[in-house]
C-alpha cells in the first residue's frame, strides 16, 4: 500500500528538514520507506511516495494530527493531491 502525496512548498530545503523530523511518526504508523521527487520545471513541487504494509496503517498515518502540523511548519503552500494505491508490479531494467 502506498500513499502518493503531491504539493508545492515555499522552500524545498526547509520542507525537507521538517519531513525528515517527521520520520519517527511515519515509522510509528508502520511505514516501511518512502521516495521523494521534485518537479523538473518547479523544484518546489514535491511528490512523496510513502509505503505502508496495510491500508489501515496508511489511513492512521494520514489521520494523525501531527501530519497537518508538520505540513504547515514545512511550508506547504498548496492543497495536497493524495492518491492511494496498491502495487501490482515492480520491474527493474538492467542497462
Give a label for each model feature.
Residues 11-33, 66-71:
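Short amphipathic alpha-helical segments
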Residues 17-20, 24-27, 39, 49-50, ...:
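Generic ordered-secondary-structure signal
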Residues 8-12, 22-28, 56-61, 89:
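Short linear motifs at secondary-structure transitions and domain/linker junctions
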Residues 2-8, 35-64, 85:
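Short, well-ordered beta-strand segments in beta-rich or mixed alpha/beta enzyme
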Residues 29-45, 69-95:
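Glycine-rich beta-strand-turn "strand-cap" elements at beta-sheet edges
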Amino acid at each position: 500500500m502506498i500513499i502518493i502525496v503531491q504539493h508545492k512548498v515555499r522552500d524545498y530545503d526547509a520542507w525537507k528538514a521538517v519531513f525528515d523530523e517527521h520520520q519517527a511518526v511515519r515509522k510509528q504508523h508502520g511505514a516501511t520507506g518512502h521516495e521523494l521527487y521534485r518537479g523538473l520545471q518547479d523544484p518546489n513541487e514535491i511528490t512523496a511516495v510513502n509505503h505502508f504494509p496495510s491500508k489501515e496503517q496508511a489511513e492512521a498515518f494520514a489521520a494523525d494530527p501531527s501530519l497537518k502540523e508538520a505540513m504547515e511548519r514545512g511550508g506547504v503552500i498548496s492543497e495536497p493531491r493524495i492518491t492511494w494505491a496498491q502495487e501490482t508490479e515492480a520491474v527493474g531494467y538492467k542497462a
